[in-house]
Amino acid sequence: MKKWLCAASLGLALAASASVQAADKIAIVNVSSIFQQLPAREAVAKQLENEFKGRATELQGMERDLQTKMQKLQRDGSTMKASDRTKLENEVMKQRETFSTKAQAFEQDNRRRQAEERNKILSRIQDAVKSVATKGGYDVVIDANAVAYADSSKDITADVLKQVK
């Protein structure tokens, strides 16, 4: 996905550069660097960790209980009565299915929330890029990852970072 995005950005940059006239002002911004430097990113990570802490603890407890039952079945299965062994096997299978279902739901919810929060931050960055570009009179702003070389005087990353913070 990232390679595709870089390729698309490079293609867009090349297409834009073909139509750019000499009078156009072009700037470079490193969005990924801004994203990594934002204090809000760490705050969001802690918020999400707290949000999902209860469910994660519950899943860990379920996993421990399931492992205990599986060990008991392996250890004592040959000496147990057939009815007791069958009952324990059924419990283990039901608990394994329940655990699997809850773990998948947890992962999906966690990924969805992380994507939501990441998109909020990226939207703030995009708004800051537009604001800085407008103030600086830039006609085109290209992500630094899509550029092979650019003069550092064209880099507006620091200005955008100040705007976002």
From Swiss-Prot:
Coiled coil: none annotated. It holds the Pfam family OmpH. Residues 1-22 form the signal peptide. Its main location: periplasm. This is Chaperone protein Skp. The keyword Signal applies. GO terms for molecular function: unfolded protein binding. GO terms for biological process: chaperone-mediated protein folding; protein stabilization. It comes from the Bacteria. Keywords: Chaperone, Periplasm, Signal. It is found in: Periplasm. Molecular chaperone that interacts specifically with outer membrane proteins, thus maintaining the solubility of early folding intermediates during passage through the periplasm. Residues 102-113 are annotated as: Lipopolysaccharide binding. Homotrimer. InterPro entries: Chaperone_Skp, Skp_dom_sf. SUPFAM superfamilies: OmpH-like (SSF111384). GO terms for cellular component: cytosol; periplasmic space. PANTHER family: CHAPERONE PROTEIN SKP. Belongs to the Skp family.
